[in-house]
C-alpha cells in the first residue's frame, strides 16, 4: 500500500512540476488541450472539479483537473475504487486506463470494478467462477432444449403412428364389411327359393255361345292333278243329272198342284 502511494505521489509531483514550468504557462490553448487529451472524458461527461474523486479521496490527496480517475470513479461510489485499489493498485489502474483509447476507458473502468468485486468475493476463481457458472447454466439450458425437442419429435411420431393405424383400421373395416356383405348376399341367394315362373300370356277374349268361333283355317294345300280331274268329272255328271233328272221334291209338288187343279172349274 505504501509503495503504491509513493508511486502515485511521484506521479502527482511530476504533474505539479509540469504545471509550474514557465514554458507550460506560455503555451497556447491548443497545446494545453493536447496535454489534457489524455484525461478526456466520454461525450456527455464533465470533469469533477468541485469535489475530489473517489480515488483522491481514498488516497487523501487533492484531486487535480488532469486526474485520470476523476471521470470514471465518482465520489458518490467510493466502494468501487476501493475494490479496484485493493486488487490491482492505483498505479496499475492508471496505467491500464491510459493504455486504452479514450472512448473505451469507461468500459475498462467498469470491467476492472467487476473483476475486483468477483476477486474479493471468490479469491480462488474470481471471474473464472462466474464464467464457469454461466457455462454450466448454458449447458443445462441446452440439455433442456434438446429434451424438449426430443419430446416434440416423439409426440409427432406418435401422432403420425396414430393416424396411420386409424387409416389401416378404417381400410380393414371397409374390406371386412364388403366381404361380409358379399357372404350375406351369397347365403341369401342360396337359401331363398327359386323365383316364380313368369305369368302366361293373356288369351284372347272368348266369343258368345251364339257366335261359335270359326274353326282355325287349315293350311291351304294344292290338290293333286288326279283329284282335280275326278272332281271335275263328278261335277259334270252331277250337272248332267240335274239337267235331265229334276229333283223329286219339285216333281212331287208339281204333281200335287196338278191334282189339286183338276178340281178347278173352267168356264164357269
From Swiss-Prot:
List GO BP terms, alphabetically: lateral root formation; positive regulation of DNA-templated transcription
* Composition bias, Polar residues: 250-268
Record region (Disordered): 191-268
Residue ranges annotated as compositionally biased, kind Low complexity, are 223-243
InterPro entries associated with the record:
LOB
Q: Name one GO cellular component term.
A: nucleus
Q: What is this protein called?
A: LOB domain-containing protein 13
Query: What species does this protein belong to?
Result: Arabidopsis thaliana (Mouse-ear cress)
Amino acid at each position: 500500500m505504501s509503495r503504491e502511494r509513493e508511486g502515485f505521489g511521484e506521479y502527482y509531483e511530476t504533474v505539479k512540476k509540469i504545471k509550474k514550468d514557465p514554458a507550460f504557462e506560455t503555451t497556447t490553448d491548443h497545446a494545453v488541450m493536447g496535454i489534457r487529451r489524455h484525461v478526456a472524458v466520454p461525450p456527455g461527461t464533465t470533469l469533477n472539479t468541485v469535489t475530489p474523486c473517489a480515488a483522491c479521496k481514498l488516497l487523501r490527496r487533492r484531486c487535480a483537473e488532469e486526474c485520470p480517475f476523476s471521470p470514471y470513479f465518482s465520489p458518490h461510489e467510493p466502494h468501487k475504487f476501493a475494490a479496484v485499489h485493493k486488487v490491482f493498485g492505483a498505479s496499475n489502474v492508471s496505467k491500464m486506463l491510459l493504455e486504452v483509447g479514450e472512448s473505451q476507458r469507461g468500459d475498462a473502468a467498469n470491467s476492472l470494478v467487476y473483476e475486483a468485486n468477483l476477486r474479493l468475493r471468490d479469491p480462488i476463481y474470481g471471474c473464472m467462477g462466474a464464467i464457469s457458472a454461466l457455462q454450466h447454466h448454458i449447458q443445462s439450458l441446452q440439455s433442456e432444449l434438446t429434451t424438449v425437442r426430443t419430446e416434440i419429435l416423439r409426440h409427432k411420431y406418435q401422432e403420425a403412428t396414430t393416424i396411420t393405424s386409424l387409416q389401416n383400421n378404417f381400410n380393414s373395416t371397409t374390406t371386412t364389411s364388403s366381404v361380409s356383405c358379399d357372404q350375406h348376399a351369397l347365403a341369401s341367394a342360396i337359401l331363398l327359393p327359386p323365383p316364380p315362373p313368369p305369368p302366361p300370356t293373356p288369351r284372347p277374349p272368348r266369343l258368345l255361345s251364339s257366335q261359335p268361333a270359326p274353326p282355325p283355317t287349315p293350311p291351304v294345300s294344292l290338290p293333286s292333278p288326279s283329284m282335280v280331274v275326278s272332281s271335275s268329272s263328278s261335277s259334270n255328271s252331277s250337272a248332267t243329272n240335274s239337267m235331265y233328272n229334276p229333283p223329286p221334291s219339285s216333281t212331287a209338288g208339281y204333281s200335287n198342284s196338278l191334282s189339286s187343279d183338276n178340281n178347278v172349274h173352267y168356264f164357269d
